[in-house]
Amino acid sequence: MANQVITGIKETAQSITGAARPWGDFLDLSAFSFPSSIADATTRVTQNLTHFRINYSIILSILLGLTLITRPIAILAFIAVGLAWFFLYFAREEPLTIFGFTIDDGIVAVLLIGLSIGSLVTTGVWLRALTTVGFGVLVLILHAALRGTDDLVSDDLESPYGPMLSTSGGGNDGARGDYSGI
């Protein structure tokens, strides 16, 4: 049982870090410049948040972990909460069933968010964690606004607009669609 848990955690960590973009691209100093307008900054933020979302998540997680390191009880609580998230949400392949009732993933997520917030409040680190996450988000948005997007390779599948940008539609004329007269 313990080996399965450790193996599952290792596989999840490897898949998360494998999905991260190369840190050299993320920190490429030659790609940084001031945006020419607010619209350019907004576009950069949107594209960089989409492209580097795993990198940003890793940074925020590390910052939050460093914040909690000063409170051992908070570390233990968040290990327990992290394991709950892992087993009840991320590692499941089939719906959660308790006493014969199937519980929707949305309900599980809301309960786990409540557990996370409850752990923050009961361990007394909620203000410190909130400040850290706020500061981290501010720094990450600043990074996203200053990092140029010219060198980013973007697939249609990676775009938040997905297939709407595809010009290779099934016999239709791309974005114009397949219209018929009334």
Swiss-Prot record:
<protein>
    <recommendedName>
        <fullName>PRA1 family protein D</fullName>
    </recommendedName>
</protein>
<comment type="similarity">
    <text>Belongs to the PRA1 family.</text>
</comment>
<feature type="transmembrane region" description="Helical">
    <location>
        <begin position="129"/>
        <end position="149"/>
    </location>
</feature>
<feature type="region of interest" description="Disordered">
    <location>
        <begin position="163"/>
        <end position="182"/>
    </location>
</feature>
<keyword id="KW-0945">Host-virus interaction</keyword>
<dbReference type="InterPro" id="IPR004895">
    <property type="entry name" value="Prenylated_rab_accept_PRA1"/>
</dbReference>
<dbReference type="GO" id="GO:0010008">
    <property type="term" value="C:endosome membrane"/>
</dbReference>
<keyword id="KW-0812">Transmembrane</keyword>
<keyword id="KW-0007">Acetylation</keyword>
<comment type="subunit">
    <text>Interacts with PRA1F2 and PRA1F3. Interacts with the cauliflower mosaic virus (CaMV) movement protein (via N-terminus).</text>
</comment>
<feature type="transmembrane region" description="Helical">
    <location>
        <begin position="107"/>
        <end position="127"/>
    </location>
</feature>
<dbReference type="GO" id="GO:0005737">
    <property type="term" value="C:cytoplasm"/>
</dbReference>
<dbReference type="GO" id="GO:0005783">
    <property type="term" value="C:endoplasmic reticulum"/>
</dbReference>
<keyword id="KW-0967">Endosome</keyword>
<keyword id="KW-1133">Transmembrane helix</keyword>
<dbReference type="GO" id="GO:0016192">
    <property type="term" value="P:vesicle-mediated transport"/>
</dbReference>
<dbReference type="Pfam" id="PF03208">
    <property type="entry name" value="PRA1"/>
</dbReference>
<keyword id="KW-0472">Membrane</keyword>
<comment type="function">
    <text>May be involved in both secretory and endocytic intracellular trafficking in the endosomal/prevacuolar compartments.</text>
</comment>
<dbReference type="GO" id="GO:0046739">
    <property type="term" value="P:transport of virus in multicellular host"/>
</dbReference>
<keyword id="KW-0813">Transport</keyword>
<feature type="transmembrane region" description="Helical">
    <location>
        <begin position="68"/>
        <end position="88"/>
    </location>
</feature>
<feature type="modified residue" description="N-acetylalanine">
    <location>
        <position position="2"/>
    </location>
</feature>
